[in-house]
């Protein structure tokens, strides 16, 4: 309430420590080391260009069967969100998901920033110094809001290696693509490609631009 960044940083630090203590207290003993490795790897996983989760980056040689229990524990504790890929945006989305391809985000964008060791002051003073990661923080923020609004399931869409839309949600009668832009530059070839191919009734783009509706694209 008093806009004290250092106080907010201390609170986030305490929350992260509490979560990590919970790993040791409540998780199955065999999964505790995996939980720590997995948790710490999420900021690095998101730093890659396509951000798809790779088991081998948690621990060299690790496979899905080695980490799946730990992943599910973090999900059931509501600490992370697993967003799976779809290639065909049709209802029901769950019928077209590729469960082997997914991204992991944290339940809270402030915790992601803290876990990624991005100083809070840099966001206000020098945001260009982490221009690329700023996009991941924006995605995590938007996802957080979608989850709060009880949209489920939430996926992301790709067309091979050619195009990718950040989020795809299932509305009552439609599938809605969502693009997230952290700045004023809102050029989005992937969203354009998606809209040309599937002709959704509505598409959403979150950016720093003012609110507007342009040919079915709500910014």
Q: Model-derived features: where do they sit?
A:
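Accessory nucleic acid-recognition modules appended to NTPase machines
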Residues: 2-169
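Hydrophobic/aromatic beta-strand patches that form the interior of the parallel beta-sheet core
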Residues: 105, 155, 178, 202-206
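Short, flexible loop segments at the rims of nucleotide/cofactor-binding pockets, characterized by
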Residues: 58, 180-182
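Catalytic cores of nucleic-acid endonucleases
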Residues: 182-218
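Active-site beta-strand-loop-beta-strand hairpin of nuclease catalytic cores
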Residues: 169-177
């Amino acid at each position: 309430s008093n806009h004290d960044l250092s106080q907010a940083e201390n609170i986030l630090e305490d929350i992260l420590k509490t979560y990590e203590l919970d790993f040791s207290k409540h998780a199955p003993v065999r999964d505790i080391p995996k939980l720590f490795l997995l948790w710490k790897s999420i900021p690095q996983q998101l730093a890659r260009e396509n951000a798809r989760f790779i088991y081998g980056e948690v621990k060299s040689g690790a496979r899905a069967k080695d980490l799946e229990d730990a992943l599910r524990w973090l999900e059931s504790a509501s600490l992370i969100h697993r967003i799976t890929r779809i290639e065909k945006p049709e209802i029901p989305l769950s019928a077209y998901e590729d469960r082997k391809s997914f991204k992991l985000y944290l339940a809270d964008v402030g915790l992601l920033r803290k876990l990624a060791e991005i100083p809070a002051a840099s966001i206000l003073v020098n945001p260009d110094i982490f221009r690329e990661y700023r996009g991941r923080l924006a995605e995590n923020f938007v996802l957080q809001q979608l989850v709060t609004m009880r949209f489920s399931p939430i996926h992301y869409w790709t067309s091979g290696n050619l195009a990718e839309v950040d989020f795809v949600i299932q509305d009552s009668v439609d599938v809605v693509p969502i693009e997230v832009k952290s700045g004023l530059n809102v050029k989005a070839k992937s969203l354009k490609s998606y809209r040309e191919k599937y002709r959704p009734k509505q598409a959403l783009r979150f950016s720093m631009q003012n609110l507007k509706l342009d040919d079915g694209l709500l910014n």
